[in-house]
Design a protein with these regions (language model features):
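Basic, short loop/linker segments at the boundary and entry of helix-turn-helix/winged-helix-like folds
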Residues: 31-79
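Helix-centered, glycine/charged polyanion-binding patches within enzymatic domains
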Residues: 276-340
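Structural motif
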Residues: 58-67, 222-223, 340-350
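Charged, often Cys/His-bearing segments associated with DNA-binding zinc-finger transcription factors
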Residues: 1-51, 364-368
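Charge-patterned, long linear interaction tracts outside catalytic cores
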Residues: 341-368
Length: 368
């Protein structure tokens, strides 16, 4: 079954079976916003991937339903609640939202502390990445994707930037080495090491602590921020395929090879589209080695730049999908309202937003 047919069948089932059932159970008819939330939750089905839940608990104090809490966090991203306290207040005051998330009664809504503990458990288990990988493989695993656009976006953190530890540099002797003198070879570059590493190994070696980032925006002005960088691969339709969180100071090119390998393990695609920050020989070679065609804007490096061929320039214009995805994540799905600390929790917060964005964009693309 093709992607559009599969999504249309699912939405038709929801319209014919689920919505009438919800209207019978709820005191107030569902609003359009609530119906949209139901569609997104049914498309993601985050509750299937929750590691610890009451139905599978055998020992210890009974835990609150983690499935309902996970659905509530997705609702938080969709409905643009900045704080967990705002989400909890809305769950207590709105029966429809409470029922959609999975809380039968008002007293079933857990405390803020329970929400916080559950969020920490989800972050530690990498729930967001697991659900996102499953979504991409289920809906796009059999599709041939034309272009994958790769870019990063600044994520402002809520913590102090960590201090960089300066490495002790050993002074080298100047001039030619003496006869019989053996000098240590230079350390291999990170990009060269990444070519022989798996994606998981390369990502683990990238720094992810909160620090200070600097970049030049589209208008040529320099911007600085404290926090992180989220590196995302996006297809032509604006669907995020892979995401990696690093420190703000990490250069974009240092994450490209792990992202290529991650995305290549999920979907088949033809072209890698990247801006001038990714213009490195190792990236061109890695893209070709994986069976893709790299189209990377050339970095002048004080030299005269040869312009792209017309057909390459036309394909490169598809890279705006990445910018639209970054913008939607920040404006519509909580990318600007990071209220947690630590890379694991920040990634979990952003992944809830990316899950909601993936489902919302999938509904738009298929016209459902």
């Amino acid at each position: 079954m093709k992607l559009k047919e599969r999504i249309s069948w699912l939405m038709g089932t929801i319209q014919q079976s689920l919505f009438p059932h919800l209207d019978e159970c709820l005191p107030v008819p569902l609003t359009e916003r609530e119906k949209h939330l139901v569609k997104i939750l049914e498309l993601i089905q985050v509750e299937k991937f929750v590691p610890n839940c009451a139905s599978r608990q055998w020992l210890g104090r009974p835990i609150k339903e983690r499935e309902a809490i996970a659905r509530a966090f997705v609702a938080k991203a969709v409905c643009k609640y900045q704080h967990t306290s705002s989400l909890r207040n809305e769950l207590q005051s709105t029966p429809n939202l409470r029922f959609i998330c999975g809380f039968a009664r008002r007293r079933d809504v857990p405390s803020e502390a329970t929400f916080s503990r559950a969020f920490g458990e989800f972050a530690k288990a990498g729930l967001g990445v697991v659900v996102h990988d499953a979504l991409v493989k289920e809906h796009l695993g059999t599709e041939l994707i034309g272009h994958v656009s790769r870019d990063s976006t600044a994520i402002v953190g809520r913590e102090k930037p960590s201090k960089k530890i300066k490495r002790a540099m050993v002074a080298k002797k100047k001039g030619r080495p003496a006869k019989g003198d053996i000098r240590q070879p230079p350390e291999p570059k990170r990009l060269d090491l990444q070519r022989t590493q798996s994606a998981e190994e390369a990502i683990c070696l990238l720094p992810s602590v909160c620090d200070r980032g600097v970049k030049r925006n589209a208008k040529g002005y320099t911007e600085t921020w404290n926090g992180f960088k989220l590196h995302i691969d996006v297809n032509d339709c604006g669907l995020p395929l892979s995401a990696v969180l690093t420190s703000a100071s990490v250069h974009d090119s240092q994450v490209a090879i792990p992202l290529m390998k991650l995305t290549s393990g999920k979907v088949d695609y033809c072209y890698d589209l990247m801006d001038a920050a990714y213009d490195a020989a190792q990236l061109w070679e890695q893209s070709r080695e994986l069976g893709h065609v790299p189209i990377i804007d050339r970095n002048p490096r004080r030299k005269e730049v040869v312009p792209m061929a017309p057909h390459e320039a036309k394909r490169y214009n598809e890279r705006t999908a990445s910018e639209r995805c970054n913008s939607r994540l920040k404006e519509d799905f909580g990318g600007r309202s990071v209220m947690v600390r630590g890379p694991q929790k920040v990634m979990m917060h952003l992944m809830f937003g990316l899950l909601a964005l993936f489902a919302d964009q999938l509904l738009k693309v298929t016209g459902c």
